[in-house]
């Protein structure tokens, strides 16, 4: 059986990257929350 997680840098960046987050209002909210919490890494 194939595992569910098949890593790909491209897909990761496109779905969870900084520019993907900045593209939507909700994505910007995510970044704001993570900044407020004091995360060193805002996006993977």
UniProtKB/Swiss-Prot annotation:
The name this protein goes by in its record: Large ribosomal subunit protein bL34
GO BP terms: translation
Organism of provenance: Alkalilimnicola ehrlichii (strain ATCC BAA-1101 / DSM 17681 / MLHE-1)
The organism's taxonomic lineage, starting at the top: Bacteria, Pseudomonadati, Pseudomonadota, Gammaproteobacteria, Chromatiales
InterPro entries in UniProt: Ribosomal_bL34, Ribosomal_bL34_CS
Entry GO terms, CC: ribonucleoprotein complex; ribosome
Keyword annotations: Ribonucleoprotein, Ribosomal protein
Annotated PANTHER family: LARGE RIBOSOMAL SUBUNIT PROTEIN BL34M, MITOCHONDRIAL RIBOSOMAL PROTEIN 34 FAMILY MEMBER
Sample GO molecular function, one term: structural constituent of ribosome
UniProt cross-references to NCBIfam families, sorted A to Z: rpmH_bact
Family, as annotated: Belongs to the bacterial ribosomal protein bL34 family.
